Amino acid sequence: TFVATFLLIIPNVAFANVVKSFRVWPSPDETRVVIDLGSEADYSYFSLSGPDRLVVDMKDTTMQAKLPVTVSDSPVLKLVRKSSPPEKGTYRLVFELKKNVQAELFKLSPTPGGQYGHRLVIDLPHGKKTATTAAKPSKPATTSKDMSTVQRAQEVLIVIDPGHGGEDPGSIGPSRRKYEKDAVLSISRKLAAQLDATPGIKTRMTRTGDYFVNLNRRVAFARENDAHLLISVHADAFTSPQPRGGSVFVLNTRRANTEIARWVENHEKQSELLGGSGNAFVTNTKDRNVNQTLLDLQFSHSQKEGYKLATEILGEMGRVAHLHNTKPINTSLAVLRSPQIPSVLVETGFISNPTEEKLLFQRAHQDKLAQAISKAVVKYLKDNPPEGTVFSPSSKPMVHIVKRGESLSVIANKYGTNSKALMAENKLKSTSLAVGQ
């Protein structure tokens, strides 16, 4: 009997990686494309013109996601499609652009909580920074001897920062369907509306939709807008479902002093990675000692004021919600590190707690939280008025010209005062007003 053994050699066609999905997040400043992968990306890229395109070659990769992807709400990106690869085993992606842009590509590792695996991120800047236009203070009105000596002092500008967004969901509740980014955006919108309705206050939001904003960009946004305060809104989380209640974090350059504070700090670093590279601020190396002294003074002031604001917020939040900490917590989160601007990070509750997860998405509870924070901010401003603002006693009087349909009580309400005070200030003998007075 003759036995023959044959070895069948089959070429290895298994791919090392797979594209699972595409996610596109247009924001006011840039369009972010996130490619979800099975493993770490091995890629190269280049740009083409006539028409403008970005070409990305991914080695040993196959496609599981559906292509093409049409993008309708981005000012720079039209379409993502496949193209003929330069060699076998490489998958070529073509990003059809509306104009020439300088793309930034970087890889992200899986998130600790397992929400996302390996990713390749492509940032396509829009060019003009539409979301970061500085808020210009109102020009003083012409001095007048008319009725309302009510030249306008500067309004207090408050930047509200809804945490996370877009590619970064923040913490995810035990139901696995509720994201921190959505709850805090809703609360932030309500807070902005509450504060904007207060005479002498106006707000700006670091994001107004579901898109990611780099942590350093959030701080820069507050600086560019000459903000008097920065309030970052988040929902807390922990590895067990038991912790519950709100907290307020304030700046401290020392290491976080509780286990939960350390967890939040480490969790935020994952969000910081989503923005690629960059430093919070760079000092002038030629005047290092002077800069250090100035920074120390600025940090000392912003830290002290931030602590005052945090204390007020905790006092009001405690009336409408359970508190996890009744005193401000010291930490060194990036969003709190602006030396010029008193900043606080408000944890509105634990999304990892099943009961609080439900509360954080209830409109009535969101309203209560927004009202509590707003009330605390107004109280802080009255007790600690920023110089040159309408809250400051030393502010120059404002001029108001009476318009048709306005009564003394309407004007008084607009400026947060009462009719009697306006009559005394303007030496009025009657509540009757004339248009143009």
Question: Could you say what each language-model-derived stretch is?
Answer:
Residues 38, 83, 98, 123, ...:
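Structured segments of extracytoplasmic/periplasmic soluble domains
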Residues 395-401, 413, 418-437:
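Extracellular LysM carbohydrate-binding repeats and other cell-envelope/extracellular binding modules
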Residues 134-284, 299-311, 367, 420-423:
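Catalytic-core regions of hydrolytic enzymes
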Residues 43, 56, 178, 285-390, ...:
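Active-site-adjacent mobile loop/cap segments within catalytic or ligand-binding domains
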Residues 37-39, 58-60, 97-99, 123-126, ...:
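Flexible glycine-/small-residue-rich
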Residues 15-158, 179, 401, 407-413, ...:
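Signal-peptide-cleaved, periplasmic/extracellular N-terminal interaction regions immediately downstream
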Residues 2-11:
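Bacterial N-terminal signal peptides
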Residues 35, 56, 95, 122, ...:
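Buried hydrophobic packing residues in well-ordered domains
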